[in-house]
Amino acid sequence: MNLVSLQNWLDNASFAVLFLTMLLYWIGAAFPGLPAINALGTAGMAIANLSIATLLGARWIEAGYFPLSNLYESLFFLSWGITTVHLIAENSSRSRLVGVFTTPVAMGIVAFATLTLPSDMQVSEPLVPALKSNWLMMHVSVMMLSYSALMVGSLLAIAFLVITRGNNIQLQGSSVGNGGYRTNGYRLMKAGELVSQPATPPVENNGFTRLESQNNGNSNTAVLNLATTPQTPTLTSTETLSPQRLSLAETLDNISYRIIGLGFPLLTIGIIAGAVWANEAWGSYWSWDPKETWALITWLVFAAYLHARITRGWQGRRPAILAASGFVVVWICYLGVNLLGKGLHSYGWFF
């Protein structure tokens, strides 16, 4: 079997494996009492990751350059990055729900590359002079890895919104992994200051549990008091969520934050590397090409997300909505500009 035939077989095999893996994750989510299904889903994602990596390796050997020169190759590299980040996120969160959201995206990318792109765009061709540079690997690969991480982080934020049903659940400590959650009006206080969350979720009632510190002589004694507050629509809706859902929401919020925190510096490095390469190739660090403009917009969206979480202390629904919007922005930056826009980065397909 020559390398071209191997690539054709691997791209179809990758699609088939991802499709079956998606079904396994969905069945596992619908029937959580089947642990074998969940294990098969993880194995399927690992097989797809290896299959795509082998395809890219064969492409590299055949063409003699890093396989990121056209849309077909970048789509497969993106899907490989998503499956890789998925495996990291799933291992960190210990939740198979991650695959319910990430697998359809990875499968859709592979399907688009395999079944939709014209055959002449799937063939490796000699590099144009502008791409004959070591910056091809240094810039494009880092950008694609950042897209992968940001997409997975955004998908986990969308999963958080689905799990919480869009309710305003405020999570404490998820940014630094302390654990614990609270709804509006529920928190732990010590001497008037926020300290930590209880080991068990609060009793659902019309009030909230509060831990206050009272000074008795030379020692501080924590006293657990039950206070009542007027019932609000937010509390009424959040009380329908089980502790299991809240715990899962906390995990998704935490992992989403960490994955986006990984993708953002990669995006920053990729943009800087691209500016240096642009200066070498075109004589200008920044020319407001549509791709450059949307890369800057993407950077600003996720910079706002991290700023809101780190500096402003946002957690829960608001940053999740911001991250979910970032998912759309990343796709516009990566695919929309390339296919529909005009500029130095356009692939010239469709229009």
UniProtKB/Swiss-Prot annotation:
Q: Which InterPro entries match?
A: Cyt_c_assembly, Cyt_c_biogenesis_CcsA, Cyt_c_biogenesis_CcsA/CcmC
Predominant subcellular localization, coarse grouping = membrane
The answer to keyword Electron transport applying to this record is: no
Q: Name one GO molecular function term.
A: heme binding
Q: Name one Pfam family in it.
A: Cytochrom_C_asm
Where in or outside the cell it occurs: the entry states:
Cellular thylakoid membrane
**Is Transmembrane helix among this UniProt entry's keywords?**
yes
Q: Tell me the keywords, alphabetical order.
A: Cytochrome c-type biogenesis, Membrane, Thylakoid, Transmembrane, Transmembrane helix
In the record, biological process GO terms are: cytochrome complex assembly
Q: Which GO terms describe its cellular component?
A: plasma membrane-derived thylakoid membrane
Q: What membrane topology does the annotation report for this chain?
A: Multi-pass membrane protein
Q: Which PANTHER family match?
A: CYTOCHROME B_B6 PROTEIN-RELATED (PTHR30071:SF1), HEME EXPORTER PROTEIN C (PTHR30071)
What HAMAP family does this protein map onto?
Answer: CytC_CcsA (MF_01391)
Hey, which family's this protein in?
Belongs to the CcmF/CycK/Ccl1/NrfE/CcsA family.
Q: What does this protein do?
A: Required during biogenesis of c-type cytochromes (cytochrome c6 and cytochrome f) at the step of heme attachment.
Question: How is this protein organized at the quaternary level?
Answer: May interact with ccs1.
Q: Per its record, how is this protein called by name? A: Cytochrome c biogenesis protein CcsA
Species per Swiss-Prot/TrEMBL record: Nostoc sp. (strain PCC 7120 / SAG 25.82 / UTEX 2576)
